[in-house]
Swiss-Prot record:
Keywords annotated in UniProt: Ribonucleoprotein, Ribosomal protein, RNA-binding, rRNA-binding
Protein name from the UniProt record: Small ribosomal subunit protein bS6
Domain of life the protein comes from: Bacteria
Gene name of the encoded protein: rpsF
Function: Binds together with bS18 to 16S ribosomal RNA.
InterPro entries given in the database record: Ribosomal_bS6 (IPR000529), Ribosomal_bS6_sf (IPR035980), Ribosomal_S6_plastid/chlpt (IPR020814), Transl_elong_EF1B/ribsomal_bS6 (IPR014717)
Pfam families: Ribosomal_S6
Species assigned in the record: Treponema pallidum (strain Nichols)
BP GO annotations: translation
GO MF terms held by the record: small ribosomal subunit rRNA binding; structural constituent of ribosome
Family statement drawn from the similarity comment of this UniProt entry: Belongs to the bacterial ribosomal protein bS6 family.
Keyword Ligase: no
Length: 93
């Protein structure tokens, strides 16, 4: 298994953030990814509007999963309407 950082940006609305972050955690666990750490970075103004939102809540996950699962997770995360954007980055050991 490799280690990855997943930066996820959710809507600034509290209820949408809680719903979305719970769904992302569940999605990671369903796909055999182990969440090593989770950091709530906070709410920030976006550099440019995403899905008509000017502010977003950032959540950083450090996950361990098989390399083949990242593409599948990326595709499933793109389909989530409550997630403004996300980025997977492989962490070098």
């Amino acid at each position: 298994m490799r280690t990855y950082e997943l930066m996820a940006v959710f809507s600034a609305h509290e209820d949408l953030f809680l719903q979305g972050s719970t769904a992302v955690r569940a999605l990671l666990q369903e796909n055999d990814a182990v969440i090593a750490r989770e950091d709530h970075i906070g709410e920030r103004e976006l550099a440019y509007p995403l899905k008509k939102q000017k502010r977003g809540r950032y959540l950083l996950f450090i996950v361990q999963c098989e390399p083949g699962k990242v593409r599948e997770l990326d595709h499933k995360l793109r389909l989530r309407h409550d997630l403004l954007t996300h980025l997977f980055v492989r962490v070098d050991s």
